[in-house]
Amino acid sequence: MAIFVGSLQIRIDMPQFTHLHVHTQYSILDGAASIPSLMKRAKEFGMTAVAITDHGNMFGVKEFYDAANAAGLKPILGCEVYVVKNHREKDKDETAGDHLILLAKNLKGYHNLVKLVSYSWTEGFYYKPRIDKELLRQYHEGLICSSACLGG
């Protein structure tokens, strides 16, 4: 595979690799990649799949899913969620929580991910959309969970 940096062509042999923690423009103040540019770059690097894991939301999932399929890439749907002790408690010590990446591995996982993100906004919002371990226990089926970052 070759990539171009300006007029310089660089040949690289890259093993199969898939990004599983990607923020788009829907992760305000943290993601700059537009979905079309993400698809273009993934194809340039010879990737066969790519994930979307925006902060606390799934606003770009439909656009991402359609764009990935159109580009011949496997879309992996996910979200970076904030986990606190009690998502209903409005306490300054419970604002940020730990960060987790949740990826849907099947349709049941997608439905559970949508439920978790919805609850984070409708029941758990306090500065940020939040869930707790009890919700995660209830809606874990079909999900892959990973630490997200240094905040995880």
For the regions a protein language model found, what residue spans apply to each?
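Phosphodiester-processing cores and adjacent nucleic acid-binding clamps
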Residues: 3-152
